[in-house]
Design a protein with these regions (language model features):
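ABC ATPase NBD coupling module
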Residues: 20-25, 78-93, 111, 119, ...
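Conserved ABC ATPase signature
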Residues: 149-153, 157
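A short, proline-enriched helix->beta-strand linker immediately N-terminal to the Walker B motif
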Residues: 168-172
Length: 276
């Protein structure tokens, strides 16, 4: 079997809280011994309610926070949490829920996309511009958007820009942290379709953090369910959705409103066909 793009072994994250008057200090076990592997070109969805540990896990695998214990391997190479190299950081990129918060409002979009190349490569200005322009096209925008500012775009367009920026350094995998939860349903479907198209074209690998099970069912190859820092269920999408084993997974599914993303996609395709 090929070397996994991402391998996580017994990953743990503890937080120490200070005590107070009549309140002893304690340790919060946010993530408890999580292990998984992720192959190239696949999508692992990490799901669970707020406080389950999925965002803490995301911060560790994006090398933002060090684990308390355990090991992370990217492309087969172990990550030294005490000394994360620039090359290792380039291998993983993250797309946040709110792209506007991660875009400099005083920076033109072309400069936003070219900046990672300026900081991390020896490309000339013309080469950086050409690659940024090409990436804009890949995410469904055009040359006319190159010199515009973030406030001039819709939420869906800004998320396309965030995805484009994350891909500029050809990372080994992307962490997508609730990337469509702030968008309207029709725009959600467009962004999900874009992510799938990019994955097919470039062989991208995703860790998809979400609480929206209808979105997870559409995008994921594998599903990992977290509950208070533990992984309580992990399997293929069809296995987890078709025959959930853990009581928490069953409860989570029963409590989640269902949005038919497939019908939204079909409706958009019909509309596009009529317009053409």
């Amino acid at each position: 079997m090929a070397t996994p793009v991402l391998e996580v072994r017994n990953l743990t994250r503890d937080y120490h809280t200070s005590g107070g008057f009549l309140r002893p200090a304690k340790i919060v076990h946010a993530v408890k011994g999580v292990s998984f592997t992720l192959q190239k070109g696949k999508t692992l969805a990490v799901v669970g309610e707020s406080g389950c540990g999925k965002s803490t896990l995301a911060r560790m695998i994006t090398l933002i926070d060090p684990p308390t214990a355990g090991e992370i391997l990217i492309d087969g190479a172990p990550v030294d949490a005490s000394h994360v190299t620039r090359e290792m950081r380039q291998k993983v990129q993250i797309v946040f829920q709110n792209p506007y918060g991660s875009l400099n409002p005083r920076q033109k979009i072309g400069d936003v996309l070219a900046e990672p190349l300026l900081l991390n490569t020896s490309m000339s200005s013309a080469e950086r511009r050409d690659k940024a322009m090409a990436m804009l096209t890949k995410v469904g925008l055009g040359p006319e958007h190159f010199n515009r500012y973030p406030h001039m775009f819709s939420g869906g367009q800004r998320q396309r820009i965030a995805i484009a920026r994350a891909l500029m350094l050809n990372p080994s995998f992307l962490v997508l942290d609730e990337p469509v939860s702030a968008l309207d349903l029709s725009v959600q479907a467009q962004i999900l379709n874009l992510l799938k198209d990019l994955q097919d074209e470039f062989g991208l690998t995703y860790v998809f953090i979400s609480h929206d099970l209808s979105v997870v069912r559409y995008i994921a190859d594998e599903v990992m369910v977290m509950y208070f820092g533990d992984v309580v269920e992990h399997g293929t999408r069809d296995a987890v959705f078709g025959n959930p084993q853990h009581a928490y997974t069953k409860t989570l599914f029963a409590a989640t409103p269902k949005a038919d993303v497939e019908s939204i996609r079909a409706r958009l395709e019909r509309k596009a066909a009529l317009a053409g």
